[in-house]
């Protein structure tokens, strides 16, 4: 599987971009939010995290490999989860990626079915399915900082963020308050080896 691609951005289209990675030019499909981020990067060197999939019908005899690109690893991970919801799939998920992943994650976490259903390709029924399946998996994405990644001190794959979030909610904090406390602490850039050290830092900041 191709997990990333780096090269010169030579074209930005409506649903895909062209990256020149010598000696080949690759077409990479992107969501609208990523496309907007790349519009001013034509001619520059870029790197996209990628997923590949096969489009077409095996019975029809035409199968076409496709690449989907994301600016950050958490965006790719979110997309992978999004596609796992029954009735979503790759094409529908890609159409829906019109807002930052952090915003989408917050909508899911807060069960905002009305706003979710307004996303391209996502109606009321699908939005309810998305919330039911993904709500508990969203804290780590809802805590993404403005730069795209969870603060460099904390990789998104780490369970520390999710475990700390769960602990704060168990201790009586609201979901939004727990998210804010973690977000502010991670933004300091400090490193945390476990949930206990992150919780300690959070409460030290709150004093």
Swiss-Prot record:
Location of region: Domain II: 72-149
A cellular component annotation (GO) from this entry: Holliday junction resolvase complex
Cell membrane recorded as keyword: no
GO molecular function: ATP binding; four-way junction DNA binding; four-way junction helicase activity
GO BP, sorted A to Z: DNA recombination; DNA repair; SOS response
Region (Domain III): 156-207
Region listing for Domain I, in residue ranges: 1-71
Cytoplasm among keywords: yes
Cellular location(s): Cytoplasm
Key words, A-Z: Cytoplasm, DNA damage, DNA recombination, DNA repair, DNA-binding
One Pfam family matching this protein: RuvA_N
NCBIfam families per record: ruvA (TIGR00084)
Family matches, as HAMAP family: DNA_HJ_migration_RuvA
Annotated family: Belongs to the RuvA family.
Function noted in UniProt: The RuvA-RuvB-RuvC complex processes Holliday junction (HJ) DNA during genetic recombination and DNA repair, while the RuvA-RuvB complex plays an important role in the rescue of blocked DNA replication forks via replication fork reversal (RFR). RuvA specifically binds to HJ cruciform DNA, conferring on it an open structure. The RuvB hexamer acts as an ATP-dependent pump, pulling dsDNA into and through the RuvAB complex. HJ branch migration allows RuvC to scan DNA until it finds its consensus sequence, where it cleaves and resolves the cruciform DNA.
Note on domains (UniProt): Has three domains with a flexible linker between the domains II and III and assumes an 'L' shape. Domain III is highly mobile and contacts RuvB.
Complex formation: Homotetramer. Forms an RuvA(8)-RuvB(12)-Holliday junction (HJ) complex. HJ DNA is sandwiched between 2 RuvA tetramers; dsDNA enters through RuvA and exits via RuvB. An RuvB hexamer assembles on each DNA strand where it exits the tetramer. Each RuvB hexamer is contacted by two RuvA subunits (via domain III) on 2 adjacent RuvB subunits; this complex drives branch migration. In the full resolvosome a probable DNA-RuvA(4)-RuvB(12)-RuvC(2) complex forms which resolves the HJ.
Name this protein carries in UniProt: Holliday junction branch migration complex subunit RuvA
Species per Swiss-Prot/TrEMBL record: Rhodopirellula baltica (strain DSM 10527 / NCIMB 13988 / SH1)
């Amino acid at each position: 599987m191709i997990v990333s691609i780096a090269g010169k951005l030579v074209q930005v289209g409506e649903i895909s971009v062209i990256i020149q990675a010598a000696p080949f030019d690759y077409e990479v499909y992107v969501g609208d939010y990523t496309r907007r981020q790349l519009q001013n990067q034509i001619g520059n060197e870029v790197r996209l995290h990628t997923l590949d999939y096969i489009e077409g019908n095996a019975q029809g005899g035409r199968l076409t490999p496709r690449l989907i690109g994301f600016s950050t690893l958490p965006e790719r991970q979110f997309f992978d989860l999004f596609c796992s919801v029954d009735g979503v799939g790759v094409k529908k998920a890609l159409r829906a990626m019109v807002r930052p992943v952090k915003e989408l994650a917050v909508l899911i976490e807060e069960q905002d079915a009305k706003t979710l259903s307004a996303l391209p390709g996502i109606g009321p029924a699908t939005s309810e399915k998305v919330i039911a399946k993904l709500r508990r998996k969203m804290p780590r994405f809802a805590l993404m900082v403005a730069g795209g990644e969870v603060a460099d001190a904390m990789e998104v794959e780490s369970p520390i963020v999710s475990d700390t979030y769960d602990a704060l909610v168990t201790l009586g904090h609201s979901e939004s308050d727990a998210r804010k406390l973690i977000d502010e602490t991670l933004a300091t850039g400090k490193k945390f080896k476990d949930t206990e050290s992150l919780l300690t830092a959070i409460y030290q900041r709150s004093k």
